[in-house]
């Protein structure tokens, strides 16, 4: 059974493993950086714990971590945040886990944090992700052409957003 919990120090080795996995990092933007290490990720975690602008979660099947997600750049003034999701364990990709956890984090952002807008960026050629985000109500707000170079070619980045729809009473 899948569950979502706050990111813990014991999750850092999984983060290192997944961020160094080409099949995960090619869609997170991490590929353009150098390989990460346990030390770097422990430093990242220490900084993360001091921040009010981030909420980071681990996706688990029982007690086994299978991915991570969160909201960053949370602006209390502008009531918006940047969403990210990575399914690190290959056995859980393409099985609806992304949709399930995206639904949870969107609800968390709009109802717990009272955000007005949740945004994300995605490579235009990541068709499964683009289609998932559109099906969840995200709309394309813009496109940056030839934004990132990896895999021997340039990739466009789409900026997408979903707005909270408050019911009128």
Feature names for model-found ranges:
Residues 64-67, 128, 154:
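Glycine-rich acetyl-CoA-binding "A-motif" of GNAT/NAT acetyltransferases
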Residues 98, 102, 125-129, 146-151:
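Short glycine/proline-centered loop/turn elements that form peptide/ligand docking sites
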Residues 111-121:
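Conserved GNAT acetyl-CoA-binding A-motif
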Residues 119-122, 139-156:
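Conserved catalytic-core motifs of GNAT/GCN5-like acyltransferases
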């Amino acid at each position: 059974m899948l569950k979502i919990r706050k990111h813990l120090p014991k999750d850092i080795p999984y983060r290192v493993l997944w961020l160094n996995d080409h099949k995960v990092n090619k869609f997170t933007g991490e590929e353009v950086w150098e390989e990460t290490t346990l030390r770097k990720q422990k430093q990242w975690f220490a900084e993360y714990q001091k921040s009010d602008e981030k909420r980071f979660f681990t996706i688990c099947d029982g007690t086994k971590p299978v991915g991570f997600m969160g909201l960053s750049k949370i602006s209390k003034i502008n009531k918006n945040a940047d969403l990210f999701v990575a399914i690190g364990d290959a056995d859980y990709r393409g099985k609806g886990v992304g949709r399930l956890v995206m639904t949870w984090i969107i609800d968390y952002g709009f109802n717990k944090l009272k955000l007005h807008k949740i945004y994300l960026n995605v490579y235009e050629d990541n068709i499964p992700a683009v289609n998932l985000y559109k099906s969840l109500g995200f709309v394309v707000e813009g496109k940056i052409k030839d934004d990132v170079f990896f895999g021997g070619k340039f990739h466009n980045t789409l900026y997408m957003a979903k707005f909270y729809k408050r019911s009128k009473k």
